[in-house]
Amino acid sequence: NGPEGKAGSAPGSAGHLNGRKRDLLEGGIRVPGLIEWPGKIRPGNTTMPAVTSDYLPTILDLICAKPGGDRPLDGISLRPLFNGAMKNRGQSIGFQSARQVALIGDRFKLWGRAGGKQVDKLPTLKLFDLVNDPSEKTDVAVQHPEVVARMTRELKIWRTSVQASDRGDD
């Protein structure tokens, strides 16, 4: 999940991707993933975003089990991806770490870094088109204000859910 330290002062490279370890830019969080179940999941590859919180819903779906209790599960089942029925993820992936926030959708990523101790307030957000600019070099927020508005609402809902989970409320 990205090379350690500041660029130039520590070994490692994120290649063409922007960011390093502990960044919520692609160079800090984009990693390959592998799921294998011989005889059950056909070999293949995808560029669809996924996250470790997708594992539990996927495993439960694969073994036809239901989660216990009434707590909501983070993540989605990737089972439809394995059989070719999933063309888009549909549900965005939220991240918050070290005064950064990010929301990754099927095409766009909303990202921001808060200054000082403003971790509870949303920072100024940038929008990156991960399909056409996986290196996150160009902020396209001005060109897509409706996407910024929609993803900002999604990010706020996601953060509220995370805060409820942190308190043990769900």
For each predicted feature, which ranges?
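C-terminal cap/loop subdomain of S1 sulfatases and analogous C-terminal strand-loop tails that border
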Residues: 3-26, 40-42, 48, 53-130, ...
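Active-site-proximal N-terminal segment of extracellular/periplasmic enzymes that hydrolyze or transfer
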Residues: 4, 138-146
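Short glycine- and hydrophobic/aromatic-rich loop-to-beta-strand nucleating segment
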Residues: 33-35
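A general alpha-helix detector
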Residues: 58, 136-139
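Intrinsically disordered, low-complexity polar regions and short flexible loop motifs
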Residues: 133
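A non-catalytic, amphipathic alpha-helix used as a structural packing/dimerization or gating element
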Residues: 143-157
